Amino acid sequence: MSWQQVAIDADSRIAERFADTLMELGALSTAIEDAAAGTEFEQPIFGEPGEPVDRLWEQSRIIVLFAADADVAMLIAAAAGEAGMPTPVYTVEAVESQDWVRLTQSQFDPIRISGRLWITPTWHDAPDANAINLALDPGLAFGTGSHPTTRLCLQWLDANICGGESVLDYGCGSGILAIAAIKLGATDVTGIDIDPQAVQASRDNAVQNQVTAAFGLPDTLEDGRQFDVLVANILANPLRMLGDLLASHVRAGGRIVLSGILEEQAQELSELYSAWFEMDPPVFDEGWTRLSGVRRA
């Protein structure tokens, strides 16, 4: 079985945002490298393991992996629209499945989220046996911990889950947020996604982490069921459409956490959700936003 590998040369000022948006839209993996690699203009850049680098090359190349049947042209055009940029020039080549496994695994090293929380790929040893380690197989769903929106949500959960909460992860992807909530002390956790592959990846990752959560498609979520915490790390457009539904699943006094929102979309989404929630100030990370708030009675 083959996959589609796409190479996109991009200005480094927009490379990360564009790669992030492609992941949100269903890319299997992304990597950013020096567009001048192997030439006299190559720029070595190094960072600490588990920590994001604070700069990129002057000109970057985004390497993106898509499923064989993905509509690459449509996805790249959609990502360009979300990122507010023209559709870039790109090349596409087929790679065999064994190359995809190697390329994907080589991207994911352990990631430190906080002083006590790490994301560790299943093929790595845990870097800190005394920390809360989330063993993750990204599978075919977004949510590896390296994306700023995932990181923002994990940091909120780490700071706010006290123990015993019920949590709904709406748009669960790989299940990373639901699994983190359980390991941080939540006792009743549900994950919902529209993609059956994401649901299966979430279930597999829960087994890998030796935790129990209920993962399913949206029609498995009971109407009117309410939770102490709802986290939704999805794109701005679905968040616009789902406001009333998401609010209905948060109890009075409960908390909502939203991400997948570009910085310039934050005010609009915060104002929209203020119809149901007392909204906190937004938190930003690499051009992305986390919104949170408390459900009014």
UniProtKB/Swiss-Prot annotation:
Could you say which EC number(s) this protein's record lists? 2.1.1.-
Q: GO annotations under biological process?
A: methylation
CDD domains, alphabetized: AdoMet_MTases
Keywords associated with the record: Cytoplasm, Methyltransferase, S-adenosyl-L-methionine, Transferase
Q: Where in the cell is it found?
A: Cytoplasm
- What does the protein in this record do? Methylates ribosomal protein L11.
**Name by which UniProt lists this protein:** Ribosomal protein L11 methyltransferase
Species this protein is from: Laribacter hongkongensis (strain HLHK9)
